[in-house]
């Protein structure tokens, strides 16, 4: 039996998900802890997602704050479980993505793994994306191999959809290599718009979006972004889809009621997921949804309506809490790194071949 901890801080910037898993050899979720992102740290990290002055110093300060928060959560989880640090084989720390530009040959996740090792006394595996990018890949999404390991126990074809800040699909089909790609904005624009208009962190259950009406001209303008017509492998991030991007489209369109903008953004998320699934010519019988989007009743309902021949449900249908899938994935990726197991999938990222992912910081 080996215990690993996964730490995930996604593009939604709402907080840190920390998952303790057991790998023996089947994977089991043992315990979890969620640490909300302080507003000051969230602002620091958001500021690093766009060009600005003194980025190197600001990045160093922000990652110091990030890693202190992560270490606090990990140590609290160990205390809660009455586990000494030496019982944990490794921490898989994704860090916080502040830039992702694989077309230019780089991806940047900050998180100071050396300090995380010092603050926890546990070996840390981090920097999972850069090896795939160095091998010509997108460096994302990395979770399809984990989705395959976790959800390929039953016969039939299925897709696993993660809806965090951005949405990505993993296609798990009989006698085919796993496929996967980013679809586009997940919650990132929905969250940004409700924060700007109503000072709320997110649209609970999609209620505000459900109160509005889709604006067809705005929707078509948003869908005209070149990313959506790009064939995979592909990935995206806040460099492309952000509040400034949305506001440029809104200025071109004129006045639209705020709730109608939210309804249109939800439709954008749903349509780009469905169109991505259809363009992949996937013979999918079920769509399993994880991430924050699994709790958005309006989004789940829209996906079900657009995919009448597909069973749409949360990953909870497989006994896996949708909130913890990504943190579990990075714990699993740490296991793969220490065991020398290649965890990227060239069919997903476009890399030149299989690669062992991650850099190791021994305790």
Swiss-Prot record:
Family designation: Belongs to the anhydro-N-acetylmuramic acid kinase family.
Catalytic activity entry: 1,6-anhydro-N-acetyl-beta-muramate + ATP + H2O = N-acetyl-D-muramate 6-phosphate + ADP + H(+)
GO MF, any single term: phosphotransferase activity, alcohol group as acceptor
The protein's enzyme class: transferase
UniProt pathway: Amino-sugar metabolism; 1,6-anhydro-N-acetylmuramate degradation; Cell wall biogenesis; peptidoglycan recycling
Gene3D superfamilies for the chain: 3.30.420.40
Coiled-coil annotated residue ranges, if any: none
Name the record gives this protein: Anhydro-N-acetylmuramic acid kinase
GO biological process: 1,6-anhydro-N-acetyl-beta-muramic acid catabolic process; amino sugar metabolic process; peptidoglycan turnover
Function according to Swiss-Prot or TrEMBL: Catalyzes the specific phosphorylation of 1,6-anhydro-N-acetylmuramic acid (anhMurNAc) with the simultaneous cleavage of the 1,6-anhydro ring, generating MurNAc-6-P. Is required for the utilization of anhMurNAc either imported from the medium or derived from its own cell wall murein, and thus plays a role in cell wall recycling.
Enzyme Commission number(s) of this protein: 2.7.1.170
Gene coding for it: anmK
Annotated organism of origin: Pseudomonas fluorescens (strain ATCC BAA-477 / NRRL B-23932 / Pf-5)
Residues annotated as binding ATP: 10-17
Alphabetically ordered keywords of this record: ATP-binding, Carbohydrate metabolism, Kinase, Nucleotide-binding, Transferase
Entries under NCBIfam families matching the protein: PRK09585.1-3 (NF007139)
HAMAP family on file: AnhMurNAc_kinase
